[in-house]
């Protein structure tokens, strides 16, 4: 799936684990996010299928991003995961993982996202739920001012 403009921007900003796993945002907008990861040897476990921790990280990242989309230039929304529930139902040893998350409910402090992980053929591999806590001001769609980068 070709990425949306917002998704393309986010991909440039993936850091840490999701960058290491090869995650790419293919859709991102108000209350939804889609992230894909190609299955490679580096994300497989000892029985040659995707490690459950990779599925959990994918659900966590997609679910969190669904809750923090901000379309305002120069602004951002922040949140942290306070609860993560993952149900592993099937697995693959090759292909692509596609995580589709959507916000089910959001308030001033907390949001809840649900996420399904499927393979490229649409077979359900995992489901999950993310409960996120917004940082101050991040519950608003316009978010907060993006902090300037330290140039020192």
Regions found by a protein language model. Give the residues of each.
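Terminal targeting signals and extreme-terminal segments of soluble enzymes
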Residues: 1-152
